[in-house]
């Protein structure tokens, strides 16, 4: 039977991608349906209990800047907050938080259940309704049919998922949850390229059986950072330490002696695992010269005795897992309460997607999260937000939107995926971005909140606070530019004492702040430059200092971006047959026909497509009258 109500957007899956997608569409005023196999696992952290990190924290800030929910949820659920790379420049500083799994899940569910325009329904989805290359709905296991103008697939590791512990395996979406087998088979019938990937998780340990007195604690930062631009430290719950232990030669010998029982090394697992989060057996074999690896013992929550040993993800048999755990310092008597495992699952080649994350072959069908070959909560959430907002726009016949590489790490993420594809689980790093200085955590709101407002995703409260911050920063910078000091003026001794070299020429407040030894906090304590921005507005104060100190570098990078954009925005029709373009080599023709890039910029980043080929393509497009601007 058909459900009586028609929806604008259906989101399938309630993980990190699905929850952001559903929220984005609903915030934009679309009637949205979130279909999940279990309402109790909305926002579930399937692997490590943490949000953020290098590159990942940047994504969370961008999600927040556009009105997403991940940053707010972790501010209410984080039990240890740290700023990584704090001693380095602002471009690579990143926020990370350990999470209480229960509090995080509660924060996500509460937000979803109180969001207007959003209905949640518990039923596994087994089929899509596709008519004339257009998705029109979804069918659940009980045969209930839901109709919608757009559908977002965010099914994580559930597509034909297979869990491995040693040489034993069974079907599963994650431990304790069934896989989506029927939906996987249905998707394989569509004209989409499909592959298999693998990820893994470590055994969970009973904290009461660990001797923490032997281990070094790792404490959070004080003062604590916050994730959301609207957040504050008062939202954080009680804080907890992590602890550090290490593998040793005995650990490594146990692993080497049991490799034939590893499904990876026995050839049972076909999927490729994440390069930057390898299993412990992979680390021991790939880094044979290392006699020790650092393991972080991370608490799973304030009311839980479970410990997540970050660094020993494994699919070895349970008896070997016990030996590995007990071989480490402080863990001699530790008990495992959940075994580690590997999971294989289907993913779909993201090169078959537009950069809006809509399928190139099925109109109105959007993909987000691990189904696109990524790994990580943050990468999934970022895609979910983008897919959700574009599904919402599609439902109202509006043109899609996506950020450029110079606008956001979300833009880097989708461009990498849709242009290059991936053969292994993709994770974000700051090193993937060409314009890191422009894509900082601290300015994510300055880059994206105005866009989010135009798209209908940013509410009045966020917009008011953002506008006030922008005005405060602009006024303070103007104030500093207007205050001048002369080297021969009286009472300069106080200023010169703060400088490595005394003033030799007239300078204003911004000139002084550009000096390496000067900070905004010091500057505003000088009577002439007091009072400055109040201590209750640290984001605005930080923005003044960064904008002033890095202005020259930022301006140079902006010039580079403007040069790049001249060709970036030339859009390419998807249905071009590149054999028609005379002058292109057979290799270039094959790669362009395979990738089907949607812009000249995207085409230029395909391996083997030369600058000469791009020039030929631009000339051909102009002759054919096909040269036009892209949606971004």
Curated annotation (Swiss-Prot):
Needed cofactors, names only, are:
FAD
State its location(s). Answer: Cytoplasm
Q: Does the keyword Protein biosynthesis apply?
A: no
Q: Name one GO biological process term.
A: tRNA wobble uridine modification
Alphabetical list of Gene3D superfamilies matching this protein: FAD/NAD(P)-binding domain, GidA associated domain, C-terminal subdomain, tRNA uridine 5-carboxymethylaminomethyl modification enzyme MnmG/GidA
Asked whether the keyword Zinc is assigned, the reply is no
Sites binding FAD sit at 13-18, 125, 180, 370
The entry lists its GO molecular-function terms as:
flavin adenine dinucleotide binding
Q: Which InterPro entries match?
A: FAD/NAD-bd_sf, GIDA_C_N, MnmG, MnmG-rel, MnmG-rel_CS, MnmG_C, MnmG_C_subdom, MnmG_C_subdom_sf
Q: Detail which positions bind NAD(+).
A: 273-287
Keyword annotations of the record: Cytoplasm, FAD, Flavoprotein, NAD, tRNA processing
Q: Which GO terms describe its cellular component?
A: cytosol
Superkingdom classification of source: Bacteria
Known role:
NAD-binding protein involved in the addition of a carboxymethylaminomethyl (cmnm) group at the wobble position (U34) of certain tRNAs, forming tRNA-cmnm(5)s(2)U34.
The record's comment on protein family reads: Belongs to the MnmG family.
Q: Oligomeric state and partners?
A: Homodimer. Heterotetramer of two MnmE and two MnmG subunits.
Name the HAMAP family on file.
Answer: MnmG_GidA
Q: What is the name of the protein in this document?
A: tRNA uridine 5-carboxymethylaminomethyl modification enzyme MnmG
Protein source organism = Proteus mirabilis (strain HI4320)
Lineage of producing organism: Bacteria, Pseudomonadati, Pseudomonadota, Gammaproteobacteria, Enterobacterales
């Amino acid at each position: 039977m058909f459900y009586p109500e028609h929806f604008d957007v259906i989101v399938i899956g309630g993980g990190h991608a699905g929850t952001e997608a559903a929220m984005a569409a609903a915030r934009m005023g679309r009637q949205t349906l979130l279909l999940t196999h279990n309402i109790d696992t909305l926002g579930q952290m399937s692997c490590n209990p943490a949000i953020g990190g290098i590159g990942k924290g940047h994504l969370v800030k961008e999600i927040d800047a556009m009105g997403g929910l991940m940053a707010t949820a972790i501010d209410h659920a984080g039990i240890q907050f740290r700023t990584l790379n704090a001693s380095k420049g602002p471009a690579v500083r990143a926020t990370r938080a350990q999470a209480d799994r229960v509090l995080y899940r509660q924060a996500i569910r509460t937000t979803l259940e109180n969001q207007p325009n959003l209905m949640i329904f518990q039923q596994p989805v087994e089929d899509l309704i596709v008519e004339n290359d257009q998705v029109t709905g979804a069918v659940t296991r009980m045969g209930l049919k839901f109709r919608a103008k757009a559908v977002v697939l965010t099914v994580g590791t559930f597509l034909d998922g297979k869990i491995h512990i040693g040489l034993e395996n069974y079907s599963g979406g994650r431990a304790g949850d069934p896989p989506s087998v029927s939906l996987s088979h249905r998707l394989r019938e569509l004209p989409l390229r499909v592959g298999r990937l693998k990820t893994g998780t470590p055994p969970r340990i009973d904290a009461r059986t660990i001797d923490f007195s032997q281990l070094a604690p790792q404490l959070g930062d004080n003062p604590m950072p916050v994730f959301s631009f609207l957040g504050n430290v008062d939202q954080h719950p009680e804080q907890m330490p992590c602890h550090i232990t290490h593998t040793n030669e005995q650990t490594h010998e146990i692993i080497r002696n049991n490799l034939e029982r590893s499904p990876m090394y026995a050839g049972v697992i076909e999927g490729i695992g994440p390069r930057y989060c390898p299993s412990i057996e992979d680390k021991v074999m790939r880094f044979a010269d290392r006699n020790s690896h650092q393991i972080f013992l991370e608490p799973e929550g304030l009311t839980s005795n479970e410990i997540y040993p970050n660094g020993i993800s494994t699919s070895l048999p349970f008896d070997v897992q016990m030996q590995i755990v007990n071989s480490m310092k402080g863990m001699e008597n530790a008990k495992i309460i959940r075994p580690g495992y590997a999971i294989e699952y289907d993913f779909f080649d993201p090169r078959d997607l537009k950069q809006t994350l809509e399928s190139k072959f099925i109109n109105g069908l959007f993909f987000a999260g691990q189904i696109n070959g990524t790994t990580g909560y943050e990468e999934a959430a970022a895609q979910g937000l983008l897919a959700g907002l574009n599904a919402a726009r599609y439902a109202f016949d509006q043109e899609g939107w996506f950020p450029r590489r110079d606008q956001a790490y979300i833009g880097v993420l989708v461009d990498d995926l849709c242009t290059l594809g991936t053969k292994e689980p993709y994770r974000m790093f700051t090193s993937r971005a060409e314009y890191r200085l422009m894509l900082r955590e601290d300015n994510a709101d300055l880059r994206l909140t105005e866009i989010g407002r135009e798209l209908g995703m940013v509410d009045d409260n966020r917009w008011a606070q953002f506008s006030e911050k922008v005005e405060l920063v602009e006024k303070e910078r103007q104030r500093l530019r207007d205050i001048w000091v002369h080297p021969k003026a009286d009472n300069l001794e106080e200023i010169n004492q703060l400088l490595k070299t005394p003033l030799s020429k007239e300078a204003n407040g911004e000139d002084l702040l550009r000096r390496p030894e000067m900070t905004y906090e010091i500057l505003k304590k000088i009577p002439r430059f007091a009072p400055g921005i109040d201590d209750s507005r640290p984001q605005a104060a930080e923005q003044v200092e960064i904008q002033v100190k890095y202005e020259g570098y930022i301006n140079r990078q902006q010039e580079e971006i403007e040069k790049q954009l001249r060709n970036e925005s030339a859009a390419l029709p998807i249905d071009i047959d590149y054999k028609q373009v005379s002058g292109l080599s057979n290799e270039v023709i094959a790669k362009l026909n395979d990738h089907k890039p949607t812009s000249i910029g995207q085409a230029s980043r395909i391996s083997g497509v030369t600058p000469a080929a791009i020039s030929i393509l631009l000339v051909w497009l102009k002759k054919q009258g096909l040269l036009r601007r892209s949606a971004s």
